[in-house]
Regions:
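Short, low-complexity N-terminal intrinsically disordered segments enriched in polar/charged residues
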Residues: 18-44
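Sec-dependent bacterial lipoprotein signal peptides
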Residues: 1-19
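Short solvent-exposed beta->alpha transition segments
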Residues: 32-37, 47-98
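Generic alpha-helix initiation/capping and coil-helix boundary signal
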Residues: 4, 24-28, 96
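Small side chains
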Residues: 11, 35, 103-105
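Exposed beta-sheet edge and beta->alpha loop/turn motif
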Residues: 88-133
């Protein structure tokens, strides 16, 4: 019995230390999830919310903001005509650059005509929030 207990008691502190370490947050994954969320808002017709995910959106003049919202609506309509719309968006991968707190999120658009397209969404972290660049 001592032969079994001694190695277990010896290893127990090391196992506890290994299990209690804080896991680092994958910033690339967080940026990718944020990009996916923004595009899901776009698909739901929440154009203001999508535009709110842009890094520079609060500094836009009203006339330019209105034009961007119009362009977003036109983009969705164009996708409906060309591909029977975008059914869903998924995160393929992401790459994080710690040097300048930026990331590239690689999203897949799954179209209604059963085709897919990969798009790259450049992201930047501002005040702890991932925003589109």
């Amino acid at each position: 019995m001592k032969r079994i207990m001694f190695p277990f008691l010896f290893a127990l502190p090391f196992l506890l230390m290994a299990c209690s370490k804080k896991k680092e947050v994958d910033q690339g994954e967080l940026a990718g999830r944020a990009a996916k969320l923004y595009y899901e808002q776009l698909l739901k017709g929440q154009y203001e919310a999508f535009l709110g995910g842009d890094n520079r959106s609060e500094k836009l003049p009203d006339s330019y903001r209105k034009q961007l919202l119009k362009n977003l609506r036109q983009f969705i309509e164009q996708q409906k005509k060309e591909h029977e719309g975008i059914d869903s968006v998924s995160l393929a991968s992401s790459v994080f650059s710690e040097k300048d707190s930026t990331a590239s999120a690689f999203l897949l658009f799954h179209y209604g005509d059963k085709t897919t397209e990969q798009v790259v969404v450049p992201m930047i972290k501002r005040k702890g929030v991932w925003m589109m660049r």
